[in-house]
Regions:
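NTP-dependent nucleotidyl-transfer catalytic core
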Residues: 1-183, 190-193, 200-205, 218
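Well-ordered secondary-structure scaffolds
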Residues: 187-188, 302
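Conserved nucleotide- and phosphate/pyrophosphate-binding catalytic cores
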Residues: 196-304
């Protein structure tokens, strides 16, 4: 299915998953009041891992959202007010619950990093975490490199450190040993892995998924009208349906692997389809399987 882009310590990580029930986390900053199509990879990833018997922790990044992730940005993000961030958390939490079973904390949890980040003592953090980060190395990270010409604020420079601290906190609190995220988060995620290994001398890992892009490298999830949201109040069911109807053939086949639980044999069978047949088959599978995981799927069925 090509669900993995990169991972740390591949052999160790495979053994780690095979030997035990693993606690994994995925962090999402509440910078909007709804997820969009680009977030489906992370939401489905958590659902898959939970289905495989592991525990997933969905982390709402209300604390890190106060800073703003510089990854992939050419300028500093607008600073959000605390009230807006809290309102976004409330809406996004409801959407997460459509993918992840949060009723049993042994299977899934939803936490907010503002609960621990806002309580931090700056000097204590510097002493605990600071010695384990090299500024020279941080400046070579992809998330910072592209900003060196246009300017990188000290505020944003701290984002990697706080995200790494999240992983450390979750490791100590819940024995969380794996972080997952999009491939554009690779540099930030490495910081947390290395921090835990240096402080606790134990295994911690991260793995990323490929970014959802078209064949020419453009991120999926946006149209000329803007983002394609999962909230039906922001993107109507018909508009959502039309977005998927217009997905190019190569991406339709890829999405079938990403967003369904179809066995590999069925996915391979779809490779024989050409042109519009790929998309028609994709939509038919949504009908047949009645995939209720996402607003995306259930509302597609309503329109169909």
């Amino acid at each position: 299915r090509n669900l993995i882009a990169q991972m740390t310590h591949p052999e160790e990580l495979e053994k780690h998953f095979n030997d035990q029930k693993v606690t994994i986390y995925h962090g999402m900053d509440p910078t909007a009041d709804s997820f969009h199509v680009g977030h489906l990879m992370g939401l489905m990833y958590m659902a898959r891992l939970q289905k495989a018997g592991h525990r997933v922790i969905a982390v709402m990044g209300a604390g890190t959202a106060m800073i703003g992730d510089p990854s992939g940005k050419t300028s500093m993000r607008p600073m959000l007010k605390r009230e807006q961030i809290d309102a976004n958390v409330k809406n996004l939490s409801k959407q997460i619950s459509k993918f992840v079973d949060l009723a049993n904390p042994e299977k899934g949890m939803l936490v907010n990093n503002a609960d621990w980040l806002l309580k931090l003592n700056y000097l204590e953090v510097l002493r605990e975490v600071g010695p384990h980060f090299s500024v020279n190395r941080m400046l070579t990270a992809d998330c910072f490199k592209s900003r060196m010409e246009s300017g990188l604020s000290f505020l944003e420079f701290n984002y990697m450190i706080l995200q790494s601290y999240d992983f450390l906190h979750l490791y100590k609190q819940y024995k969380c040993s794996v972080q997952i995220g999009g491939d554009d988060q690779w540099s930030n995620m490495l910081g947390g892995v290395e921090l835990i290994r240096r402080i606790h001398r134990t295994g911690s890992y991260c793995l990323t998924w490929p970014l959802l892009t078209t064949s020419d490298g453009k991120k999926m999830g946006k149209t000329e009208q803007g983002a394609v949201w999962l909230d039906p109040e922001k993107t109507s069911p018909y508009e959502y349906y039309q977005y998927w109807r217009n997905v190019e053939d190569a991406s339709a086949l890829k999405c079938l692997g990403y967003f369904t639980y179809l066995p590999q044999s069925e996915l391979d069978a779809h490779k024989k389809f050409k042109g519009q047949d790929v998309l028609n088959s994709f939509m038919e599978k949504l009908r047949q399987k009645k995939l209720k995981r996402a607003r995306a799927n259930s509302l597609l069925l309503e329109v169909l």
